[in-house]
Design a protein with these regions (language model features):
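C-terminal catalytic "cap/lid" subdomain
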Residues: 1-236
Length: 236
């Protein structure tokens, strides 16, 4: 592999881990994702991963007005820790060295996040899973992904989604929606395009970290993106 990027942050939604099951895990699909990531790590690419928690809990949506926002967000953070534990075990069964760093102290789950420690693990060849988002309510896991990418000095963020790029409108509702091959952060913000939330997009822009949005339906796309193949949309 002739990788275009040396160190990346891969953001995977919790819903993606469930695939067609919608909740919990589709371990056949999770294994395919982990195999694709491991193949890239084996070629020397340093990979950090942030996983959402939507396969277990979707924060305010699932709170339905009965759970306060702070509590709902903390429940979401715990859901990401559950996902990291599962994915870490799959990596280890595949023979990969995987580590969990958490934004909150959760004994038995992982070590407390420290940027220098994360970089040290990455340079050793470990796949590093970042759990519990940013550790603070009111911030999405997309924002946490950009924050961790900046802290580990990642060359790019790979935003693996259930859609194959950034569109001018929702392609599921508007058949005339056009997919962008490339788009600027400013245009994403000005047009309110559904890439990441505005906090995450602004943070990526401020730190000049390109974001590649692509479909995770075929996990092998991770390797293709790392090789520089033009898949999805690059936001920069």
């Amino acid at each position: 592999m002739q990788a275009k990027y040396k160190r990346v942050l891969v953001k995977i939604s919790g819903e993606a881990l469930a695939a067609d099951k919608h909740t919990g895990f589709d371990f056949a699909f999770v294994s395919r994702v982990c195999e694709a990531v491991k193949a890239c790590a084996d070629e020397g690419v340093q990979i950090g991963i942030v996983i959402g928690g939507g396969n277990f809990w979707r924060g305010v949506k699932d709170g339905a007005g009965k759970v306060e926002r702070v509590s709902a967000d903390r429940m979401g953070m715990l859901a990401t820790a559950m996902n990291c534990l599962a994915v870490c075990d799959v990596f280890r069964q595949l023979g990969a060295d995987a580590r969990i760093l958490t934004a909150m102290d959760i004994q038995g789950v992982g070590e407390r996040f420290d940027a220098r420690k994360a970089i040290e693990y990455l340079e050793r060849g470990s796949i590093v899973l970042f759990a519990c988002g940013s550790g603070h309510p009111f911030f999405s896991t997309d924002t946490a992904a950009v924050l961790r990418a900046a802290e580990i000095q990642a060359d790019a963020i790979l935003l693996a989604k259930n859609i194959d790029g950034v569109y001018s409108d929702d392609p599921r509702k508007n058949p005339d929606a056009v997919r962008f091959d490339e788009i600027s952060y400013d245009e994403v913000l000005a047009r309110h395009l559904a890439v990441m939330d505005t906090t995450a997009t602004s943070l990526a822009m401020d730190n000049n970290i390109p974001v590649i949005v692509f479909a995770l339906a075929e996990p092998e796309n991770i390797g293709k993106v790392l090789e520089g193949e033009k898949l999805g949309t690059i936001v920069q």
